[in-house]
């Protein structure tokens, strides 16, 4: 008889993991479709590039480690990592950026720690932060939503810009980022951060085309509502628990409301925080990662609330417009401590 010595975790249900990942991917469809509608074909191209890169990088590492490639790839975790990173970056970012970010996420942030179940940080957010710090200009080159865009690129222009940096007619990103008012556009949170630093008040900024007649910015409020719909479905079918998304959103809403009441001229309103940027994507699809989140119910409440406070602090006082990725990683650091102090009491033992 031959005994095989394996490292922890000792129990691993491959089929269950694959099914959960697949359900999360299905829940992402409304968010992906809405981003495609408002920002064009670039979102789909980035997803394809990221998924191919993630699967290739994972297969390469598994081969080097003499692990079963096909069996592990079937858990769909690499596919989900690529997808989450792809929908987080600008649709027309250069092709090599999403490849670099995805490869870094899979190899360094996941496989270097031993693979699925052993990584302390969310791999997709590690990849995103590496790209944001290394290439800040390219990572803020979001297109204006089609409803306020002067030019809406088709598939040919999209591919041309992603792979060459220019449209078929010789234009570049500055042309595509032009709004109907002739002014280069950015995301609502980018616009808010830049304009506040220029001395404008929140009331003045709300008159910009990207905010005009909107709760939280053209396109972005619908994107967030779509991710919310997918997240609610995940809750309904019990793929994720309510503790993290609810505590995160309540914490963010509470901080945003208090800040707005005390400084309405310099701090964004609650609806902007709730329905702009990656709020709903983070709440339901990123923070709820079972590997990098707290494992106790009380711990999940603390973990989500902490992330909500961090998002508000970074958005309001930090150097980056959207703080979801940094908040997730900072909250990941605290998980061992949170789990230690929130672990259930063992019956028959006194509290020590």
From Swiss-Prot:
One Pfam family named in its UniProt record: NQR2_RnfD_RnfE
EC numbers: 7.-.-.-
Localisation per UniProt entry: Cell inner membrane
Record membrane topology: Multi-pass membrane protein
Enzyme class: translocase
Membrane spanning residue stretches: 20-40, 42-62, 68-88, 89-109, 123-143, 217-237, 244-264, 267-287, 301-321, 322-342
Names of the cofactor(s): FMN
Record-stated family: Belongs to the NqrB/RnfD family.
HAMAP family according to UniProt: RsxD_RnfD
Subunit structure: The complex is composed of six subunits: RsxA, RsxB, RsxC, RsxD, RsxE and RsxG.
Full protein name: Ion-translocating oxidoreductase complex subunit D
Name of the gene: rsxD
């Amino acid at each position: 008889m031959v005994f095989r010595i394996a490292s922890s975790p000792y129990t691993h249900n491959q089929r269950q993991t694959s099914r959960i990942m697949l359900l999360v991917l299905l829940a992402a469809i409304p968010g992906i479709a809405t981003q495609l509608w408002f920002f064009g074909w670039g979102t789909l191209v980035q997803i394809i590039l990221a998924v191919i890169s993630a699967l290739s990088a994972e297969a390469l590492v598994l081969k080097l480690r003499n692990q079963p490639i096909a069996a592990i790839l079937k858990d769909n975790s690499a596919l989900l990592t690529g997808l989450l990173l792809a929908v987080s970056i600008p649709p027309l970012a250069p092709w090599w950026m999403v490849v670099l970010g995805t490869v870094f996420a899979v190899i360094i942030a996941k496989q270097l720690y031993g693979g699925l179940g052993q990584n302390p940080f969310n791999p997709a957010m590690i990849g995103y932060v590496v790209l944001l710090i290394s290439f800040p200009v390219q990572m803020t080159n979001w297109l204006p939503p089609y409803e306020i865009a002067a030019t809406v690129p088709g598939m040919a222009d999209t591919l041309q810009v992603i792979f060459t940096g220019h449209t078929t007619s010789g234009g570049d990103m500055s042309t595509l980022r032009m709004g109907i008012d002739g002014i280069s556009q950015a995301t609502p949170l980018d616009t808010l951060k830049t304009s506040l630093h220029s001395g404008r008040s929140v009331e003045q900024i709300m008159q910009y085309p990207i905010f005009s007649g909107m709760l939280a910015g053209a396109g972005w409020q619908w994107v967030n509502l779509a991710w919310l719909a997918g997240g609610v479905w995940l809750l309904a079918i019990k793929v994720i628990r309510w503790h993290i998304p609810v505590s995160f959103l309540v914490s963010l809403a509470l901080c945003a409301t208090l800040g707005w009441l005390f400084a309405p001229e310099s701090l964004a309103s609650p609806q902007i925080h709730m329905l702009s940027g990656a709020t709903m994507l983070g709440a339901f699809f990123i923070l709820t990662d079972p590997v990098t989140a707290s494992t106790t119910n009380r711990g999940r409440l603390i973990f989500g609330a902490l992330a909500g406070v961090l998002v508000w602090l970074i958005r309001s006082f930090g150097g980056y417009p959207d703080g979801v990725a940094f908040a997730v990683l900072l909250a990941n650091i605290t998980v061992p401590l949170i789990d230690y102090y929130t672990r259930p009491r063992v019956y028959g033992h006194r509290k020590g």
